[in-house]
């Protein structure tokens, strides 16, 4: 019994599972049909969108602003209805999925319990103990019954003592068979009692289990109701959270757009800054070139001035040497002449000759001193040249420093100018002092020369005057003494000049050391500043390179997006041409139907026209075909969607499969690849969200299409009922066909003809108003679906851009 019941429950569960699977398959089929209907509705929406644009133009030309406001309010109302329908569908879908998942889990649990009951693995010991307990209880009750029966039987046997007494003389072998004969029957009865009691106990346990199971099922149903209520509440909270999430998503998207705008502004500012830095660098290079030219010109001028000074010094030296040579030659010739005259003189003049020789020796010493002074002057000029060279070197160093430090402050330039002026003043002072000393030496030399000439003249006079020779000798001695004093004065003067020169050299060396130290410190500072400036320039160059790279990447992305947009425009233009062609055909068909309807309404006597109209209305594709094959345009648009899907599937496979991707170029770094993958994930997430929205819109459009079909069926039944009522009121019983009914309705001179026309006019007016409302609904849906289709079509393009760019 337990196994039979478990198998029945298992079969019932299997049937429930099969029903759920069939429902799932039906829902999937309905979803597929809804997708096909959505494709057809998209085509209709595109067509209605075109019609709406034309109608809007006509409205803008013909109608007033109030009617436009009414239409806009109705449009907003329909949008609100559409959103409410979407939310209802979401709630229903979520509840159905939750119930389905719960039922699946319950089915799995019940299958597991059934399997455990069949196998008996987990509770084998417990089941064995329960079976033994039942068997022992049944055996106990059976034994008790047997004991009672035996007691009754033995009581009856004790009442019959005579039978027992007669049997005492018999041998014991005859007494034993009487109790042994009923033993198998008692055992069978005992077993039968045991089995019966065991079955009773099992039946009681089974009833208890069924009652407990019913209580448990009722409890589970109550819990299911509570859970469904909780699920509804959670669904409502989920809808609220979904709306909040959408608002947050919109806010985040706006923030991202603001950040992108800020980034573009920062890029523009960086570009402007780099341009300014380039302009400043070019201006600095130009100023450096100008300063180099100026320093080169100054250097050339200094070199020319130095050469001119050297030429002047050389000419002065040569002139002085020539004059001294001439003077010495003249003096030597005169002395020789005088010596010849002195030799011709008497022996008295020997002393005078010796004195003259001494004077000549003194003159030679003076000449040697003059030569030494000239050598010292040359040394001084050489020192002056060395000082000038050092000054020029210093100027060159200062010029180089000035060229490297053009962008420094004006204070440092003024300090450098002050140092230069001080140095030039020192050089000018040293030069003036040297020139003054040279002039003094020249004056001393001239005075000495004049004195010597005067002495020579005096000697000539003394030679002429032989009489006053002694006086002249005395005068010469006095002159010799005076010359000795002049010699001492000259020696002292030379010592003072040497000491002053040594002091000046020491001072100049000290000043040169100080200047060198200052220049070394300044050079170190300038080198550090120059290194900092170079580092800044290098950083600016790196930033510029980075900006250039980002600009090139952005340009490439813009180019890729433009190419994708062109491709989409081409596809859209092809679809648009097809839709235009279909629109033209539909318009022609509508015009023909309108003409026929007008002919029927105007010509009330033409029966064939009305019959053809009704037959064409009954046999029209809009009556016979609904859903995915409502018109030719739906078929063409469905084919286009299939082509798009077939073209999108290899593109997705190319973008998703890592083996089919082309090798990554060497220019892309790991960070750029990570950014591309992140962008790909974001675009895929956006695409999935848009696909969900499109699915919801497809479901809502499918429901609207079903409403349209129902309304069209209601209109058909209304038309048919009205015609049947009219035919019954006229008393016609011939209902064999629609042609006979129409011929009865359109009899000439019939009174119901006007009522028929009025009903047809009312029906047409109602149909036109309904068509206008549906037009508006379809226009709203077309705008939404076109926007979503553009987003869905545009979202995979960024996924493929890196591959195309590679």
UniProtKB/Swiss-Prot annotation:
Domain of life where this protein originates: Eukaryota
Subcellular location per the Swiss-Prot or TrEMBL entry: Early endosome membrane; Recycling endosome membrane; Cell projection, Axon; Cell projection, Dendrite
Modified residues (Phosphoserine): 620, 631, 633-634, 653, 655-657, 795
One of the GO BP terms on file: protein transport
Disulfide bond entries: none
GO cellular component terms, A-Z: axon; dendrite; early endosome membrane; glutamatergic synapse; recycling endosome membrane; Schaffer collateral - CA1 synapse
Compositionally skewed regions (Polar residues) per UniProt: 617-635
InterPro entries: GRIPAP1
Residues bearing PTM N-acetylalanine: 2
Post-translational modification: Proteolytically cleaved by caspase-3. A minor C-terminal proteolytic fragment of 30 kDa is produced. Proteolytic cleavage is required for JNK signaling activation.
Membrane topology: Peripheral membrane protein
Compositionally skewed regions (Low complexity) per UniProt: 647-659
Expression (tissue specificity): Expressed in the central nervous system, including cortex, cerebellum, midbrain and spinal cord, and in primary cultured hippocampal neurons but absent in non-neuronal tissues and cell types with the exception of neuroendocrine insulinoma cells.
Coiled coil: 4-158, 204-606, 666-700, 750-779
Chain residue ranges for the region called Disordered: 616-635, 646-671
Main localization, broad class: membrane
Annotated keywords: Acetylation, Cell projection, Coiled coil, Endosome, Membrane, Phosphoprotein, Protein transport, Synapse, Transport
Site feature (Cleavage) residues: 563-564
Function, as annotated: Regulates the endosomal recycling back to the neuronal plasma membrane, possibly by connecting early and late recycling endosomal domains and promoting segregation of recycling endosomes from early endosomal membranes. Involved in the localization of recycling endosomes to dendritic spines, thereby playing a role in the maintenance of dendritic spine morphology. Required for the activity-induced AMPA receptor recycling to dendrite membranes and for long-term potentiation and synaptic plasticity.
Subunit structure, interactors included: Interacts with GRIP1, GRIP2 and AMPA receptors. Interacts (via C-terminus) with MAPK8/JNK1 and MAP3K1/MEKK1; the interaction promotes MAP3K1-mediated phosphorylation of MAPK8. Interacts (via N-terminus) with RAB4A (in GTP-bound form). Interacts (via C-terminus) with STX12.
Protein name: GRIP1-associated protein 1
Gene name tied to this protein: Gripap1
């Amino acid at each position: 019994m337990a196994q039979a019941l478990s198998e029945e429950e298992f079969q019932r569960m299997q049937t429930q599972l099969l029903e759920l699977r069939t429902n799932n398959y039906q829902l999937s089929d309905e979803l597929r049909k809804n997708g096909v209907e959505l494709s057809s509705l998209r085509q209709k929406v595109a067509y209605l969108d075109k019609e709406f644009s034309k109608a809007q133009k006509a409205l803008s030309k013909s109608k007033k602003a109030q009617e436009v406001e009414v239409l806009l309010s109705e449009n907003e109302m329909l949008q609100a209805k559409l959103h409410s329908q979407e939310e209802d569908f979401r709630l229903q879908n979520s509840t159905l999925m939750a119930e389905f998942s719960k039922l699946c889990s319950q089915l799995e649990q019940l299958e597991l319990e059934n399997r455990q009951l069949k196998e008996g693995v987990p509770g084998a010991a417990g089941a064995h103990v329960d079976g033994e307990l039942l068997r022992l209880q049944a055996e106990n009750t059976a034994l008790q019954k047997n004991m009672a029966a035996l007691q009754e039987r033995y009581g009856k046997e004790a009442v019959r003592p005579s039978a027992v007494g007669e049997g005492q003389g018999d041998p014991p072998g005859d007494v034993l068979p009487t109790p042994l004969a009923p033993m198998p029957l008692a055992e069978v009865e005992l077993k039968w009692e045991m089995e019966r009691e065991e079955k009773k106990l099992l039946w009681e346990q089974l009833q208890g289990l069924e009652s407990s199971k019913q209580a448990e099922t009722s409890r589970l149903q109550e819990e299911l109701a509570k859970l469904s209520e909780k699920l509804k509440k959670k669904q409502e909270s989920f809808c609220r959270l979904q709306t909040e999430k959408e608002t947050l998503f919109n806010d985040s998207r706006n923030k991202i757009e603001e950040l992108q705008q800020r980034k573009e502004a920062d890029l523009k500012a960086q570009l402007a800054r780099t341009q300014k830095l380039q302009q400043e660098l070019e201006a600095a290079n130009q100023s450096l070139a100008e300063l180099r030219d100026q320093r080169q010109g100054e250097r050339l001028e200094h070199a020319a001035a130095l050469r001119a000074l050297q030429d002047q010094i050389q000419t002065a030296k040569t002139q002085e040497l020539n004059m001294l040579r001439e003077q010495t030659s003249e003096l030597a010739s005169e002395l020789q002449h005088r010596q010849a005259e002195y030799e011709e003189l008497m022996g008295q003049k020997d002393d005078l000759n010796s004195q003259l020789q001494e004077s000549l020796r003194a003159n030679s010493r003076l000449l040697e001193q003059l030569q030494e002074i000239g050598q010292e002057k040359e040394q001084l000029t050489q020192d002056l040249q060395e000082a000038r060279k050092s000054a020029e070197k210093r100027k060159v160093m200062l010029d180089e420093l000035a060229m490297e430090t053009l962008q420094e402050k004006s204070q440092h330039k003024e300090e450098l100018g002050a140092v230069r002026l001080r140095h030039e003043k020192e050089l000018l002072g040293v030069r003036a002092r040297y020139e003054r000393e040279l002039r003094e030496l020249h004056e001393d030399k001239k005075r000495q020369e004049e004195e010597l000439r005067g002495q020579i003249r005096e000697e000539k006079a003394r030679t002429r005057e032989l009489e006053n020779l002694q006086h002249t000798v005395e005068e010469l001695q006095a002159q010799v003494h005076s010359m000795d004093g002049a010699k001492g004065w000259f020696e002292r003067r030379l010592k003072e000049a040497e000491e002053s020169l040594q002091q000046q050299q020491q001072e100049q060396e000290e000043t040169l050391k100080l200047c060198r130290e200052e220049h070394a410190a300044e050079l170190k500072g300038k080198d550090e500043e120059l290194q900092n400036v170079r580092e800044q320039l290098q950083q600016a160059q790196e930033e510029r390179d980075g900006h250039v790279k980002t600009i090139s990447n952005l340009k490439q992305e813009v180019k890729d997006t433009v190419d994708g947009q062109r491709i989409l425009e081409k596809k859209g233009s092809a679809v648009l041409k097809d839709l235009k062609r279909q629109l033209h055909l539909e318009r022609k068909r509508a015009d023909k139907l309108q003409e026929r309807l007008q002919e029927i309404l105007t010509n009330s006597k033409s029966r064939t026209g009305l019959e053809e109209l009704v037959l064409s209305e009954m046999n029209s594709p809009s009556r016979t075909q609904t859903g995915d094959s409502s018109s030719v345009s739906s078929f063409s648009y469905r084919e286009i969607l299939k082509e798009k899907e077939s073209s999108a599937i290899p593109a997705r496979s190319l973008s998703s499969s890592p083996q089919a991707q082309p090798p990554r170029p060497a220019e892309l770094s790991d960070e750029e690849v990570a950014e591309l993958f992140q962008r790909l994930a974001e675009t895929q997430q956006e695409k999935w969200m848009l696909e969900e929205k499109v699915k919801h819109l497809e479901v809502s459009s499918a429901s609207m299409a079903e409403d349209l079909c129902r309304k069209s069926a209601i209109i058909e039944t209304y038309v048919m009922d009205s015609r049947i009522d009219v035919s019954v009121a006229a008393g016609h019983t011939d209902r064999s066909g629609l042609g006979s009914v129409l011929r009865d309705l359109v009899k000439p001179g019939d009174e119901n003809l006007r009522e028929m026309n009025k009903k047809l006019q009312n029906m047409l007016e109602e149909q036109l108003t309904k068509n206008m409302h549906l037009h508006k609904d379809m226009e709203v849906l077309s705008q939404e679906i076109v926007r979503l289709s553009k987003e869905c079509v545009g979202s995979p393009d960024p996924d493929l851009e890196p591959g195309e760019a590679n």
